[in-house]
Amino acid sequence: MSLTNEQIIEAIGQKSVMEIVELIKAMEETFGVTAAAAVAAGPAAGAAAAVEEQTEFNVVLAEAGDKKVNVIKAVRELTGLGLKEAKEKVDTAPQVIAEGLTKEAAEDAKKKLEEAGAKVELK
């Protein structure tokens, strides 16, 4: 049975950010490709170098704050980790919660964690 593009997109849309990151890594390994965007040719010699904007972000839990239970729930939601693993990450902050996210996905993850009471950094 073959899936339509719409079915694939719908299935991906129901996954968490961390599940999508894992899917991308698996696809890169399976097909021997990278998901990195193609790099355009650099400026001509003598031209001023353009400042390159960061495209991949890591979400770092700096501190759990007072609402530790809410932060653990948010970490579980974002990562798909079990209760024990999420609690260990929160208890041993600072910890990287998600790696290689787009700016929008990283800001969404940061917002969820901050709403739960955590202090978060994007790197």
UniProtKB/Swiss-Prot annotation:
Cited InterPro entries: Ribosomal_bL12, Ribosomal_bL12_C, Ribosomal_bL12_C/ClpS-like, Ribosomal_bL12_oligo, Ribosomal_bL12_oligo_N_sf
Any Pfam family the entry gives: Ribosomal_L12
Keyword Transferase listed: no
GO CC terms in record: cytosolic large ribosomal subunit
Keywords recorded for this protein, A-Z: Ribonucleoprotein, Ribosomal protein
Top-rank taxon, per record: Bacteria
Transmembrane annotation, as ranges: none
Biological process (GO), any one: translation
Alphabetized GO MF terms: mRNA binding; structural constituent of ribosome
Job of this protein: Forms part of the ribosomal stalk which helps the ribosome interact with GTP-bound translation factors. Is thus essential for accurate translation.
NCBIfam families: L12
Assembly notes: Homodimer. Part of the ribosomal stalk of the 50S ribosomal subunit. Forms a multimeric L10(L12)X complex, where L10 forms an elongated spine to which 2 to 4 L12 dimers bind in a sequential fashion. Binds GTP-bound translation factors.
Family indicated by similarity: Belongs to the bacterial ribosomal protein bL12 family.
Identification of the protein by name: Large ribosomal subunit protein bL12
